[in-house]
Amino acid sequence: MHQAISMHDGSSRFRGFRSIAIANSTHGKYPTGADSWIQHTRDIIFSLTGEKVVLLTSTGSLNWELQCYLAARAGVAQIIILPATRTHFHHRMIECADQLGVDPDLTEFLPLEAARENLRNYGEKRDRFILEMADRIIPVSVRPNGRLESLLRVIQPHGKIDASMQIHWAGSPGLPVKLPDAEAVRNIVDPILEGWLIHWTRASQGPWPGEKKCDFFRDLLESRSEYPRSAQKTFQRILSEKKIRASSWRIRNNQPVVAFSALPPSQALRLMRWRPRYVRFSFEPFGIAVEPETASASGIREVIYLESPDPPPEEIPAYLFQGRGKKGDWPIEQEYRHPGDFDLTGLSRNEVQPADLMEMITKTNKAVD
């Protein structure tokens, strides 16, 4: 497959094809298959099957990468615009093809100069480049007074915009999270998990760690009103895989770790809050609890909170250090970390157990009744 991947140049196999760009604004971090812009984009791309057209697509945002995936599924030719780099561009093409599951016989890659530009500036340059290159532009869901609408307004006099399939723009709804009653957690769950370390999950913005984008898009299109990578589905994936996947987000030296908290569930509940800066919850009421001795034997260690920016001692792994933050709120999480993925295989219910707070409360109340 990698041998067949090619760059778009003067000898393009799509010479004579009519180029099409489908224009969508950003809609939010947690889309579902029921979102109108996704359904309309899918229908338009599948309507192009068998036509002598080539779709202009790109990467770097969900609305562009979804089109790459849909074009591959519909058997529609595409030219994927990627940031140009002095080195490793061929590797980037291979990775993109693998992640999005594109058909190498129907795909070419076109580099777009991106040197010395930040991500936002490149995104504007990419969108303008695609719209100017296209023979036909199909707006689907464009945010009023947004950057994309401004670009379309400039291009409109050229007469290549087909607005016949455009729908009203509506941002994706927020992520619904139902938290259990704090008193019930304190009275029912805290005694069960006293002293245990808990890894709390949250919704994933896009693919799970270790998951290909094409698998995420497959599930997104099949989903209805529920986001396919919600905290609950992440929790279910951990149980089915018997593995907690590590993340390097905000960890020294980008060391992938699995984080745990020593807080009783009722206290952890107070920290489950929406974080506007990251457009997500800190964590949600679905966790994996590990018995203390098992945690220690498995290599889970307590995080050391630093008062100063000075480098930590070399004899202690860097991933165990964490700055206190400007408000000094990191220590209240009582965090522990495990280097790399945490394997649940072979651990008994006495050593590790799921901590779905709502389910634990419901089961206990039913047993009492």
Task: Describe each PLM feature range.
Residues 1-188:
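Glycine-biased, small-residue-rich flexible motifs in mid-sequence functional cores and linkers
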Residues 165-369:
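NAD-dependent ADP-ribosyltransferases
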